[in-house]
Amino acid sequence: MNDYHLEDTTSELEALRLENAQLREQLAKREDSSRDYPLSLEEYQRYGRQMIVEETGGVAGQVKLKNTKVLVVGAGGLGCPALPYLAGAGVGQIGIVDNDVVETSNLHRQVLHDSSRVGMLKCESARQYITKLNPHINVVTYPVRLNSSNAFDIFKGYNYILDCTDSPLTRYLVSDVAVNLGITVVSASGLGTEGQLTILNFNNIGPCYRCFYPTPPPPNAVTSCQEGGVIGPCIGLVGTMMAVETLKLILGIYTNENFSPFLMLYSGFPQQSLRTFKMRGRQEKCLCCGKNRTITKEAIEKGEINYELFCGARNYNVCEPDERISVDAFQRIYKDDEFLAKHIFLDVRPSHHYEISHFPEAVNIPIKNLRDMNGDLKKLQEKLPSVEKDSNIVILCRYGNDSQLATRLLKDKFGFSNVRDVRGGYFKYIDDIDQTIPKY
């Protein structure tokens, strides 16, 4: 570098130092001028359009928001719309619990994340987004899976909790811990084109999740968005409504006198609708919030409340090892020129899954249709005219779960003997064998 360029660079650095000093001085003056106000001057500008809405309570309401701590469990389809609106509104501290990482398949609905953050922890991605949106708030992340051992430590100190999870097990856990800590919960769920929302344990007088659902749904009735799909704007609206309900709680819109338990149901298709149903209140016999409750902090932390056992789990491991083949073994027989002459290739995914991406040689009979045949071979032969009791049948599904159930069904109900499923399913084949196939 010659002397001219060195001198020029030195001058630029000096100018930057001077500008930095001036900015610091201006900031100090602004902070000094706002000492007599509950908010900084920048915060008055930031929240002004919100404070002039009469229902928010003006400056006093904004101070309530600033002094409130809200914990959001899940930074997915529900948490993504709720988080930025809570941050934008000025909630003073926001906690985010999520140990998942951002995946490409999330981005159509979890719009707080973006393509550059694939592989990043969702809680960290969310933290980066909302702190850029509002630098006046404090954000705490918990990159862990919520369980009986850590829930009390995480929840402690928060005023409100948003349950943005997608499993009954976690909903029971969140509700139980919140009741024991005296925290109000905004709880929601969504799937496909629909969603629902409610408020649990309002001010320790409202019903908890167990008051509504004393027993969990059977495992085979529970569908995740990974299995059933979800429309982004539909789940987004429900998440946004969660933020609205949280603001109403913080601002005191709901009181012990006017609060009535409710369940809001949103449907996006074919025409959008929003219905609100009155729900029953706190139940005296409830095991968690009733008079003789047994679900206590001690019982939960000691593991006496077995949530996995209580909620159950669908058992997919129903096949013997010799009834399953690896994707490598499947690849070898699939590439055989006489594959179709020797085998019947059955894809048991739902038809709309099959239409997205499939092997051209596979015949699609959804597992639901197989069940409806109730072991009637003639009904199966209407779909597969060439199938016989001694046919070699290879079954494929999305992940290798339904294919096991279908294998068991064909053997036990229909009487077939030569049936095998592909371990790991269609997606395992794509990951390990052929990445050129569309993966949805």
From Swiss-Prot:
GO terms for biological process: cell budding; cellular response to oxidative stress; invasive growth in response to glucose limitation; protein urmylation; regulation of pseudohyphal growth; tRNA thio-modification; tRNA wobble position uridine thiolation; tRNA wobble uridine modification. It is found in: Cytoplasm, Cytosol. The modification Phosphoserine is found at residue 326. Keywords: Acetylation, ATP-binding, Cytoplasm, Metal-binding, Multifunctional enzyme, Nucleotide-binding, Nucleotidyltransferase, Phosphoprotein, Transferase, tRNA processing, Ubl conjugation pathway, Zinc. Pathway: tRNA modification; 5-methoxycarbonylmethyl-2-thiouridine-tRNA biosynthesis. It comes from the Eukaryota. The active site is at 225 (glycyl thioester intermediate), 397 (cysteine persulfide intermediate). Residues 339-438 form the Rhodanese domain. ATP binds at residues 77, 98, 105-109, 122, 166-167. Its cofactor is Zn(2+). The modification N-acetylmethionine is found at residue 1. Zn(2+) binds at residues 208, 211, 286, 289. GO terms for molecular function: AMPylase activity; ATP binding; identical protein binding; metal ion binding; nucleotidyltransferase activity; sulfurtransferase activity; thiosulfate-cyanide sulfurtransferase activity; URM1 activating enzyme activity. Pfam families: Rhodanese (PF00581), ThiF (PF00899). Its EC number is 2.7.7.-, 2.8.1.-. It is an enzyme of class 2 (transferase). Binds 1 zinc ion per subunit. One of its GO terms (cellular component) is cytoplasm. Present with 2620 molecules/cell in log phase SD medium. Plays a central role in 2-thiolation of mcm(5)S(2)U at tRNA wobble positions of cytosolic tRNA(Lys), tRNA(Glu) and tRNA(Gln). Acts by mediating the C-terminal thiocarboxylation of sulfur carrier URM1. Its N-terminus first activates URM1 as acyl-adenylates (-COAMP), then the persulfide sulfur on the catalytic cysteine is transferred to URM1 to form thiocarboxylation (-COSH) of its C-terminus. The reaction probably involves hydrogen sulfide that is generated from the persulfide intermediate and that acts as a nucleophile towards URM1. Subsequently, a transient disulfide bond is formed. In the N-terminal section; belongs to the HesA/MoeB/ThiF family. UBA4 subfamily. This is Adenylyltransferase and sulfurtransferase UBA4. It comes from Saccharomyces cerevisiae (strain ATCC 204508 / S288c).
